[in-house]
């Protein structure tokens, strides 16, 4: 067998963020993949130890734009565990609304990029146009289109009055039928999508367990793990929703899981807007921070996000560390790419929705 090596990245038109792949190929088939990280390392975990507990909310929001609610929420949960603060019920519902709003926008961005990679740019623009409904909603409700700045220690920074609820529901009423009746059927049946994604980048459920995969990548292979179900936080244990699961473990299944989850997220937001009780949106003043340790986890758009926080009795953490889904998922690219065509590499990489800024932190 005569093989040769193709370098892809760190700057490449098919990559959303800098990654370097050293890909060994035999003809048009991929034999092995070596991934090199470190191109956007920013030392954020170290920076967190030089900032106080309030400044770190802003810092964690900037770990990743698409997960900019998950990071500060998980950080706040860890800090609340150490201080013993109890988040008011209304604030818990508002946290879920912010969480699911970001999930819809994140998933839509990923599947839009899929359409762009296969050359279906009219579909890409259609998805991005529909995504603007959520972007406009974020700007109107939270004041920002990307880093929505919704989280506070012991609660949230925003609230929804009747007009705000009505506006939110109106936006969902515009988005949901567009996804359900116009966009998702194209991903399910259009040959431009189906022929390029079915049977590509296959992962078995056993592979998911072996590699510790999570998020839509694992659920696309039928591996039923979702923090919102297995270890519910906020008010997810009071909400009615089904976990989205795929059957084939390929690029297409992962895209379909993201579409199903987008619709599920819309349903969760509706439930929260309907059931949210009256009351405060934040607990009382933050008490003095005792020395202690805590671990918190949430279901970010890409999968399980874990934060470890160690405090020493001051207002600055002694250690703040997070483990993101991409860190676990990208090793499985070796399995997904083995035997794949060179032209399928961008599709396979995009299917794990890699967030390099999260991972290299």
Swiss-Prot record:
Which one Pfam family would you cite for this protein?
NiFeSe_Hases
Role = The carbon monoxide dehydrogenase (CODH) oxidizes carbon monoxide coupled, via CooF, to the reduction of a hydrogen cation by a hydrogenase (probably CooH).
GO molecular function annotations of the record? NAD binding; nickel cation binding; oxidoreductase activity, acting on NAD(P)H; quinone binding
* Residues binding Ni(2+): 64, 67, 355, 358
- Show the InterPro entries listed in the entry: ComplexI_49kDa-like, NADH_Q_OxRdtase_suD, Ni-dep_hyd_lsu, NiFe-Hase_large
Q: Which cofactor does it need?
A: Ni(2+)
Q: Which family does it belong to?
A: To E.coli formate hydrogenlyase hydrogenase isozyme 3 and to bovine mitochondrial NADH-ubiquinone oxidoreductase.
Species of origin: Rhodospirillum rubrum
Q: What is this protein called?
A: Carbon monoxide-induced hydrogenase
Query: Does the keyword section mention 4Fe-4S?
Result: no
**Keyword terms of this UniProt record:** Metal-binding, Nickel, Oxidoreductase
The record's section on PANTHER family has: FORMATE HYDROGENLYASE SUBUNIT 5-RELATED, HYDROGENASE-4 COMPONENT G
């Amino acid at each position: 067998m005569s093989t040769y090596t193709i370098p892809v990245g760190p700057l490449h038109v098919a990559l959303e963020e800098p990654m370097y792949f050293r890909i060994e190929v035999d003809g048009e088939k991929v034999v092995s993949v070596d991934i090199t990280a470190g191109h956007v390392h920013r030392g954020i975990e170290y920076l967190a130890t030089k900032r106080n507990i309030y400044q770190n909310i802003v810092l964690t929001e900037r770990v990743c734009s698409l997960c900019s609610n998950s990071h500060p929420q998980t950080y706040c949960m860890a800090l609340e565990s150490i201080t013993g603060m109890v988040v008011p019920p209304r604030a818990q519902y508002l946290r879920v609304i912010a969480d699911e709003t970001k999930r819809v926008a994140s998933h839509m961005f990923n599947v839009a990029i899929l359409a762009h990679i296969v050359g279906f740019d009219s579909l890409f623009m259609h998805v991005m146009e529909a995504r603007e409904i959520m972007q406009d909603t974020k700007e109107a409700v939270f004041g920002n289109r990307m880093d929505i700045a919704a989280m506070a220690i012991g609660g949230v920074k925003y609230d929804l009055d009747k007009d705000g609820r009505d506006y939110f529901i109106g936006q969902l009423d515009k988005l949901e039928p567009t996804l359900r009746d116009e966009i998702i059927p194209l991903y399910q049946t259009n040959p431009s999508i189906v022929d390029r994604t079915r049977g590509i980048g296959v992962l078995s459920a056993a592979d998911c367990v072996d590699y510790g995969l999570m998020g839509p990548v694992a659920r696309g292979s039928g591996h039923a793990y979702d923090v919102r179900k297995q270890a519910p936080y906020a008010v997810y244990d009071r909400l009615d929703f089904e976990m989205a699961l795929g059957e084939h473990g390929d690029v297409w299944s992962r895209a379909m899981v993201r579409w199903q989850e987008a619709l599920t997220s819309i349903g969760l937001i509706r439930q929260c807007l309907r059931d949210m009780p009256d009351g405060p949106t934040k607990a009382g003043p933050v008490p003095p921070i005792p020395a202690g340790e805590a671990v918190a986890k949430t279901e970010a758009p890409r999968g399980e996000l874990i934060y470890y926080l160690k405090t020493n009795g001051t207002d600055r953490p002694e250690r703040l560390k997070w483990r993101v889904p991409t860190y676990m998922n990208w090793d499985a690219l070796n399995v997904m790419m083995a035997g794949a065509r060179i032209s399928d590499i961008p599709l396979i990489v995009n299917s794990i929705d890699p967030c390099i800024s999260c991972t290299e932190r």
